[in-house]
Amino acid sequence: MGIDKRKDDHIYLASSELSQIGSAWFEEVVLIHNALPEIDLSEVDLTTRFLGAPVKAPFGIGAMTGGTELAGKINAELAKAAEEFGIPIYVGSQRIALVKPEVKWTFEVVKQNAPHVPKVANLGAPQLAELGERELEEWVVQAIDMIDAYAIAIHLNAAQEVVQPEGEPRFKGVLEKLKIVKRAAGKPLIVKETGNGISKEVAARLSGIADAIDVGGFGGTSFVAIEGARAKESPLQKRLAETYKWWGIPTAASICEVKSAYAGYLIASGGIRSGLDGAKAIALGANFFTMSQPLLKAALDGRLREEIAMIIAELKTAMFLTGARTVQELALVPRVYGPRLRNWIEQRRLTC
């Protein structure tokens, strides 16, 4: 199957309920209500910095798509919304545009429609493993130039690669290749997962290399489940996907994992479905959060701006009801953890 057909499959399957697996454990986090917040709702200030760049909220549009006509239209709409709301935007994996230059436009629409907000380029770890140093440097520069990126993300998707019919489960040497990416980019380097989470052990290995870690935790869109749905001609891949679609570290736990071993910028993603979930992520220790599936679905339904406005209103309300005037104050609000998250923190000896 061609890579362009695969990209469109991913769009439709990711926007469906079939792709939604498990819980990110945000129900395990209760922010304590402040009945006397001593602030007005109008005083709540969402502005913050994304890896040094000023943005209007600690929330961005996560990595989704690119490479097909449908993806190009979606990326244009996402970029327009990012520009309107003053929030960062990731693009989906740019590999397809590097091997098929005729589809570069499906990514270039992002810089055309969002010239003033931080944009994040995106390449996959398996491509790092297979490329030589010079070719990798060229890919990094091209990916950044394609969207005028402020930062570059390298996504870790080992579980997806194992079950994908066209998968490339090659990860040997990726850590050293990340150093090449960082040097070639001359931009902030984000290392992100895609739905299975990042542990404290991996976070520790990324210290000094990654400028940011995006946890990409379990409990939302499962690319393992998506690849299982695509694997109609491969019983083995379908069986593997069915077995491993529940594999991973729930997002709330992954935030605590990374926070315990990594002092850099921490981005939460994976199963965040409201501004309240995002507020909980920040209270747990994240500096920023992104959402993908709800925004993809909203874009396909023609209600993207309404969805973003609702997420921002939910986040602002959470801050008001906890007495947090700023994002920095939100990180300090009192909270209570449910038994699953509390047990995880204790067994893994985490700070959260």
Swiss-Prot record:
Key words, A-Z: Cytoplasm, Flavoprotein, FMN, Isomerase, Isoprene biosynthesis, Magnesium, Metal-binding, NADP
Originating gene: fni
UniProt keyword Magnesium, yes or no: yes
Binding, FMN: 63-65, 93, 122, 192, 221, 271-273, 292-293
Database matches in CDD domains: IDI-2_FMN
Catalytic function, reaction form: isopentenyl diphosphate = dimethylallyl diphosphate
Compartment(s) where it occurs, according to its Swiss-Prot or TrEMBL record: Cytoplasm
The protein's name in its UniProt record: Isopentenyl-diphosphate delta-isomerase
Organism annotation: Pyrobaculum aerophilum (strain ATCC 51768 / DSM 7523 / JCM 9630 / CIP 104966 / NBRC 100827 / IM2)
Function summary: Involved in the biosynthesis of isoprenoids. Catalyzes the 1,3-allylic rearrangement of the homoallylic substrate isopentenyl (IPP) to its allylic isomer, dimethylallyl diphosphate (DMAPP).
Annotated binding of Mg(2+), by residue: 161
